[in-house]
Amino acid sequence: ALLHQLCKIPVVSDFRSADVQAGGQGAPLAPLFHAALAQGMPKPLLVVNIGGVANMTFLGADGGILACDTGPGNGPLDDLAQKFLGLPYDKDGALAASGTVDEARLEALLGHPYFARPAPKSLDRLSFSGLIAQATEGLAPADAAATLAAFCVAGIARAPLPAPPLRVLVCGGGRKNPVLMAGLAAAFDVPVEPVEAVGWDGDALEAQCFGYLAVRSLRGLPLSLPTTTGVARAMTGGVLTG
């Protein structure tokens, strides 16, 4: 309502409530936008978004879409950089690159039952906070960062995909972290590239996504599917003001 008052234009908001009320998890909401952008590209294609939480959109050769949150993304690394470096994030993955992964603690993190659940599934940014605090306690900051970066990558690599992708495209702030990108390249035996490689604007992608969802909302088209949020049926959503 405030945005409508300030801008004097119709505003679509509250994209998630209808999905949640119909039994869905309300996230992730980008998969249909990813599918629209990827029309004409060879499939299967995996689009990975690494924000505070990491999530993936799998676009099948048969036109199917599967999505889920894969695990923590940049969030724990950002928290670590703020705590030990006084910086909002680990620029260029420098802290993680200078450390060594603690394999035993990494395996403890990956023992969380979330990773055994099928897709679709979703997380909150703080879902792993307690476990991460335990797993990084007593580690040197660089080793903690290296371990958390490996945790992010392993969560993505263990995503329940129906088939191996031909290509992995990465969006979100994590695409600018060389440690995460190198980890993904090692985990997938296919090209792993930032979305700019196919002409997408990685910095604007999320804003573009919700503009696209707003138009779908105005047209009464679905914003989520049973295979993206777990909702019982394809679900539209959004609330128009103005």
Model feature map: region roles:
Residues 150, 196-242:
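Glycine-rich phosphate-binding/hydrolytic loop that grips phosphoryl groups
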Residues 138, 157-167:
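Phosphate/pyrophosphate-binding loops at sites that engage ATP/ADP/AMP, CoA/4′-phosphopantetheine
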Residues 66-153, 229, 233-242:
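Conserved ATP-utilizing enzyme core subdomain
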Residues 4-87:
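Phosphate-binding/catalytic loop of phosphoryl-transfer enzymes
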Residues 165-187:
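Glycine-rich phosphate-binding loops at beta-strand->alpha-helix junctions
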Residues 22-32, 144-155, 206:
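A glycine-rich, Thr/Ser-enriched phosphate-binding loop motif common to dinucleotide/cofactor-binding enzymes
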